[in-house]
Design a protein with these regions (language model features):
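Generic protein-terminus/edge-of-domain signal
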Residues: 1-56, 71
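Hydrophobic packing within well-folded, soluble alpha/beta domains
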Residues: 51-54, 59, 167, 180
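Aromatic-acidic/polar surface patches that form glycan- and anion
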Residues: 25, 69, 128-131
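A hydrophobic/aromatic-rich effector-binding and dimerization subdomain
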Residues: 1-16, 59-126, 140-148
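Glycine-centered loop/turn positions within well-structured domains
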Residues: 40, 65, 173
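Short, Lys/Arg-enriched, Trp-marked, Pro/Gly-tolerant hinge/linker segments that flank
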Residues: 98-108, 122-135, 140-184
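Short coil turns linking two alpha-helices in DNA-binding domains
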Residues: 187-188
Length: 188
């Protein structure tokens, strides 16, 4: 498994693009996905979630995820990357928790979320307080509408997955075999 670490934690970044296969990646941003055409598969930890047009999903900071596209035809989505510091009242919870099921189906997506996603894709270079307000609206719905679980519950107990996750989370540090073995609960 090829893992990518992306530095996406400064302000806001938005992309409206064709969906493609994306290998497992990890970044410090809150990632929001809103499917505008077709379908996409969102993989979070060991789970794969099917998304269709109008579905909304969120991936919290430092959670390994990937994308796959199986549908033929036009598949497009809005991808928003928000710096966690934009939402100080949610910052601590964003570090500890993750949605158990990261998708809200089209028929249940609150209009506030849709309006905020559409506003954010057009507001990248304007007033940061307005950007912050839209981010707060989205997270307020996420934390009230989605069941949260401890981030440690996302993923797998598989030793390979755990090793990749450890390296991804500690790649900026010098990695020692004995420290990694201790963290993974295996002998050196």
């Amino acid at each position: 498994m090829l893992l990518t670490y992306e530095k996406k934690n400064e302000g806001i970044s938005a992309e409206w693009k064709k969906t493609v296969h994306v290998p497992p990646l990890l970044h410090e941003a809150i990632e929001i996905i809103y499917v505008t055409d077709g379908t996409v598969e969102l993989g979070v930890g060991q789970e794969l979630f099917h998304m269709e047009e109008g579905d909304f999903a969120i991936v919290f900071p430092n959670v390994i995820h990937h994308y796959q596209v199986f549908g033929s035809g036009k598949n497009k989505a809005i991808y928003l990357f928000l710096e966690p510091a934009l939402t100080p009242s949610f910052y601590e919870d964003l570090q500890k928790y993750s949605p158990k099921y990261p998708i809200i189906r089209r028929e249940k997506v609150p209009m506030d979320i849709i309006n905020s996603v559409k506003a954010l894709i057009n507001l990248q270079d304007t007033n940061s307080m307005i950007i912050q307000a839209h981010a707060q609206i989205i997270l307020a719905h996420v934390f009230s509408d989605m069941e949260m679980v401890d981030k440690d519950a996302i993923g797998s107990d598989d030793i390979i997955y755990c090793a990749v996750e450890y390296v991804a989370k500690h790649f900026r540090e010098e990695i020692f075999r004995y420290k990694m073995a201790y963290h993974l609960g295996v002998s050196n």
